[in-house]
UniProtKB/Swiss-Prot annotation:
Signal peptide: none annotated. One of its GO terms (biological process) is methylation. It comes from Streptomyces tacrolimicus. Monomer. This is 31-O-demethyl-FK506 methyltransferase FkbM. Inhibited by S-adenosylhomocysteine and sinefungin. It comes from the Bacteria.
Amino acid sequence: MSDVVETLRLPNGATVAHVNAGEAQFLYREIFTDRCYLRHGVELRPGDVVFDVGANIGMFMLFAHLEHPGVTVHAFEPAPVPFAALRANAVRHRVAGRVDQCAVSDEAGVRRMTFYPDATLMSGFHPDAAARKELLRTLGLNGGYTAEDVDMMLAQLPDTGEEIETSVVRLSDVIAERGIAAIGLLKIDVEKSERRVLAGVEDADWPRIRQVVAEVHDVDGALGEVVALLRGHGFTVVAEQDPLFAGTEIHQVAARRTAG
């Protein structure tokens, strides 16, 4: 598996390393144009520590850095090819912090995951080829493509991913090892593993976290569980679904503390 990445000039003039241009452009629209991680009162402040869990190529890392150059970003991405782009982007843009090639969950160790070279944003620990194609079909239709065009694009998409092994860390272990006193924003995008990421935060560490924004796949009551967990730890929580994801299980949860 090659870790060679290409570069793309974004509409804001920044150049990023990427795995494929279509995904990079999608991420730019979501993160820079729509500012999807800064809604419902969520904000970045100078000097914030940001945890980017499921960083992919680091588009949110770059956004946070450009929004407030004084922030420090800890970015986590398990798949080697996106990680190569993530690391290149951190170096190119001199982002303060560090990048780690690992997954985040509720138990440290080593696990196997599925990496999709042609749809890296869907890589993760819960492979489901049929569900993946149905999601892509819905996104295509919601995005304004005709059913014929969507089916043609899906027919060209490989059905299989690559099995890879990755190290796994717990957030509370990272917080302790790095001496993190406060996290201004914890961003999570981990393809159905968000509950396990949050379960890796010990009760004593929750007061350190000011804000959480997570993509949540509402499978087996996940959305309700995540909302309840965050409210239980003192956050004001808003859950919403972007029109692009209408008809899918994907929602976004924004949580913040109303004081401090």
